[in-house]
């Protein structure tokens, strides 16, 4: 990882290193001349692409521009994704549509909200289900029990144990993005505080975004 004018090396091992191995890592020279900053310009584009292949099933996906990580706003979108996945898309895309899998996810790091299906015998109808799911949520067509189930699902995913190496990498990544332990706890607490109105607001936000 390049940070400011210094290069950082993150080294994670599942085995105990010998002193010789540790000394070897410490002896590596990562210094370099000049500035490490690179100016790159990006422009957002939204493409609608279909790639026909000789198969009876499809992979379909739809993505939306969503807010970058914020302890206050992000919980609304992560709960919306869980609600759509478990209460709407599972029934429409998998049970009724016949897809092997599908769902919705929100990535706060990239600011992207995604819906997808795979091994899906349908195509256009599935895309319509994606759009209709946001209409369903924006109309508040869900109850408090569904919201509670979504909160428990999200918190279970946050709290699930990982390997020591996985925990080390996760902690490094979050700290490098200025997400302190206090910041993360605030995010977790805010998941409890999300209301039905918050989820409706998040759905309305995505409905008005290009895809």
Describe the residue ranges of each PLM region.
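Substrate/cofactor-recognition hotspot
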Residues: 82
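An aromatic/glycine/proline-enriched structural segment found at the starts
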Residues: 8-60, 66-68
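M16 family metallopeptidases and their MPP-like homologs
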Residues: 1-14, 59-79, 89-196, 210-211
